């Protein structure tokens, strides 16, 4: 007979290796971190394809929750309560296109029922196959779904009482989930959150960033943080930089290939006042946002503008730095707040440049930040988000508190 007291863990499953600079991985790791900060016995589970994956000891006992490695802590700005359990995925896993050598299949069909299940109270994942496997094995689950898909949900899963709640970030995706078979009462919209470490003022580190990026103390600094993709408005920002040659622009984020591509583009266009910094570790990003005179959110119009819930926007708020943003459908609810300093139409470099110039003239940089956005963002902490999600879980199914 199974001992119910052994079932204590709140499992967050990610189907990709860590760390990587993808926004969805930042979201998932911070969601797990928040649950741990609330006092739940939280374990972040993800595939490990490194040298340790072939260690016989790890293969014999693959689920071993442990302290989060320093590399992950710095990469995602995590705290010390979160545990991790990398699942060994030795060769030939993911080296051949086959269901039997797919790491997600192995995690769902083997590691979950035989190794993770005995101590698991609740599962939380953006991986639908893992959520399905948990429910089929009698484990309650929470599903996160942040992008439009046309694939219908399996009725036997979405109507199963073990599926506690599904979470998305904008109403348009909630509507498409319902259209695809998710019961309306089982899906909620919740914004992403901000990491509370972004609220800690770091004036010395901010000064170091300005000294590193600016030619002299009188120059202004505009910072963008996020993915380096066209729909995010990077090409627009490059054109804005061309219109404002005396202002320094800096972009944090992107894969090395994307950084190289944009560096080549600005070189060809002979634009010398925009720098691409690549992925900036989260423990360094907070001070970069505080170093800026203005933060840019130049998202373009189009399909992505209807469902994006930009993670970095909440970190922008926490920095207290003035923000210029394009008006896109998914941000409509913020237009009546004081959190964003200036709005302009998307896809228009000249209008964005006008807004930046106005903010630079009317909102001088404050070392302590502007209080409006700092106060506004407090409601969007990852911990508040985690608590809200867990309020939809049956009390008898909640994981163990270890505070």
Model-derived regions: residue spans:
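Carbohydrate-associated surface elements
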Residues: 172, 193
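Conserved donor-binding/catalytic core segment of Leloir-type glycosyltransferases
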Residues: 11-13, 167, 216-232, 238-241, ...
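Nucleotide-sugar-dependent
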Residues: 22, 229-232, 281-287, 293-317, ...
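A short helix/loop element that forms part of the nucleotide-sugar donor recognition site in Leloir-type
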Residues: 200-215, 365
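Conserved acidic donor-binding segment of nucleotide-sugar-dependent glycosyltransferases
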Residues: 341-350, 357-364
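Nucleotide-activated donor-binding/catalytic signature segment of Leloir-type glycosyltransferases, i.e.
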Residues: 250, 260-287
């Amino acid at each position: 007979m199974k001992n119910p007291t052994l079932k204590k863990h709140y499992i967050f499953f990610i189907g990709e290796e860590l760390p990587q600079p993808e926004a969805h991985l930042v979201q998932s790791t911070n969601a797990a971190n928040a649950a741990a900060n609330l006092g739940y016995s939280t374990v972040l589970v993800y595939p490990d394809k490194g040298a340790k994956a072939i260690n016989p000891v790890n293969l014999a006992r693959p689920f071993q929750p442990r302290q989060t490695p320093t590399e992950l802590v710095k990469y995602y700005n995590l705290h010390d309560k979160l545990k991790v359990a990398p699942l060994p995925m030795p060769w030939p896993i993911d080296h051949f296109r086959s269901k039997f050598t797919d790491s997600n299949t192995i995690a769902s069909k083997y590691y979950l029922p035989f190794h993770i299940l005995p101590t698991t109270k609740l599962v939380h994942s953006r991986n639908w196959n893992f959520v399905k496997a948990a429910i089929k094995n009698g484990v309650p689950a929470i599903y996160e779904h942040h992008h439009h898909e046309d694939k219908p949900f399996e009725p036997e899963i979405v109507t199963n009482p073990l599926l506690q709640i599904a979470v998305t970030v904008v109403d348009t995706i909630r509507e498409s989930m319902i259209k695809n078979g998710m019961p309306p009462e089982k899906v909620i919209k919740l914004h992403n959150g901000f990491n509370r470490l972004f609220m800690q003022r770091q004036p010395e580190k901010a000064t170091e960033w300005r000294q590193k990026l600016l030619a002299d103390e009188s120059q202004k600094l505009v910072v963008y943080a996020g993915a380096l993709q066209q729909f995010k408005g990077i090409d627009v920002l490059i054109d804005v930089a061309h219109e404002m040659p005396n202002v320094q622009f800096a972009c944090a984020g992107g894969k090395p290939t994307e950084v190289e591509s944009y560096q080549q583009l600005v070189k060809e266009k002979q634009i010398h006042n925009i720098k691409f910094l690549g992925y900036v570790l989260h423990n360094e990003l907070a001070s970069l946002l505080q170093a800026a005179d203005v933060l840019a959110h130049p998202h373009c119009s189009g399909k992505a503008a209807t469902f994006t819930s930009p993670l970095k926007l909440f970190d922008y708020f926490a920095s207290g730095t003035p923000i210029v943003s394009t008006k896109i459908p998914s941000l409509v609810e913020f237009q009546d707040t004081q959190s964003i300093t200036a709005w302009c139409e998307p896809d228009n470099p000249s209008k964005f440049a006008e807004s930046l110039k106005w903010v630079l003239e009317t909102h001088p940089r404050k070392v302590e930040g502007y209080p409006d956005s700092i106060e506004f963002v407090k409601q969007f902490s990852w911990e508040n988000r985690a608590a809200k999600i867990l309020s939809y879980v049956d009390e008898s199914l909640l994981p163990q508190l270890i505070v």
